[in-house]
C-alpha cells in the first residue's frame, strides 16, 4: 500500500480532484475534470488512477447542513459506485459540508476574485474533503 489517496468533489459541470498522502495527512489540488451533466471523461479518471495508483478514492458526499440528503447526494453516490465498478478500487464517501465555502474563502484570500475560477474552487474543495478525511483518523 502506497498510502496515496485521490479525492473527488463531484459536480454536474466540473469535478474537483486532489491527491494526498496518508503519512503526511496533506493533499494538493490537481486539474478539475469537466463533466457533462455529471458524467466525466472516464479516460481521464483512468489516467489519474494509473498515474497515482491510489489505495482508495474519497468522494465528497454533498449533504444539507442538517445532515439530510439533497438532490446531488444520490448523483455523488452513483459517481462513487461507477468508479468502484469500472476500476475495482476502494471508494469511500465523506461528508463535504462547507468544503466549497472554505475553498472559495481560501482562494479569495490568495488572489481575490480572479482566483475564484470554477475548476480551482472544485479542486480546492477536493483538497479540503481529503484533508478532513485524514483529520478524522482514516
Swiss-Prot record:
Set out the biological process GO terms recorded for this chain's protein. Answer: DNA damage response; ribosome biogenesis; rRNA 5'-end processing; transcription antitermination
Mutating residue 100 to I: what's the consequence? Does not process pre-16S rRNA in 70S ribosomes
Gene Ontology MF, one: 3'-5'-DNA exonuclease activity
- Coiled-coil segments on the chain, per record: none
Pfam families from the UniProt entry = RuvX (PF03652)
Effect of loss of the gene = Essential, it cannot be disrupted.
Q: Does the keyword Nuclease apply?
A: yes
GO CC field: cytoplasm
Cell location: Cytoplasm
Primary location group: cytoplasm
Q: Which top-level group of life is the source organism from?
A: Bacteria
Look up the EC number in the record and give it.
3.1.-.-
Entries under Gene3D superfamilies matching the protein? YqgF/RNase H-like domain
Keywords on record: Cytoplasm, Hydrolase, Nuclease, Ribosome biogenesis
The record, for HAMAP family, names: Nuclease_YqgF
Say which family it is in: Belongs to the YqgF nuclease family.
Q: How does it assemble?
A: Monomer.
Relate the protein's function as given in its record. Answer: Involved in the processing of the 5'-end of pre-16S rRNA during 70S ribosome maturation (processing does not occur on total cellular RNA off the ribosome); may be a nuclease. A temperature-sensitive yqgF mutant no longer grows when Rho or NusA are overproduced, and has reduced transcription of genes encoded downstream of Rho terminators; transcription increases again in the presence of the Rho inhibitor bicylomycin.
This chain's protein is named Putative pre-16S rRNA nuclease
| Natural source organism | Escherichia coli (strain K12)
Question: What does the organism's lineage look like at the top?
Answer: Bacteria, Pseudomonadati, Pseudomonadota, Gammaproteobacteria, Enterobacterales
Instruction: Quote the gene name from the UniProt entry.
Output: yqgF
